[in-house]
Amino acid sequence: MLPQFRQWVLVNNSGQTLTFNNNGRINIKETAWIIDPTTGKITYTQLADDDLGFVAAGSLANGSEIVGDNEVDNTANLYLGSQVQIEITHDEGTAADGTFDLYMAEGDASGELQTDASGYASASANGLKRKATLVWESNGLDDEVMRSPVREVE
């Protein structure tokens, strides 16, 4: 079952800075699922795409991370799991060679996430669980769009 509260954290290990004003984009696509108590069938709900707050004038240096600006409340829907995919448009795609790693900060009924804590340092330092990885394999184009494989998250 997905945690009661959660938030995405994306780490850029692509070897290059991602810059919004040069056409760099981040998009996390997610479809959540639950077993319908009436029919017993799996019901899917496409959640809003999440850009993690990566907006105009934003940049994400190699080796740094962005903590999403959306904290997802799962207390009403009680989703059991979801499928997630990372979609990146890399403005320095020809020079990039590495990964984008997606982590999940989790919280319980108190709503406190690891990313909320005053001692939060980074996804790896705080032991967040990696949920998906996009391996950047350039096709020789800048402003190229790549998508990770779809991963099941529970």
Q: Where are the model-predicted features located?
A:
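Surface-exposed, low-hydrophobicity beta-strand/loop segments enriched in small/polar/acidic residues
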Residues: 1-154
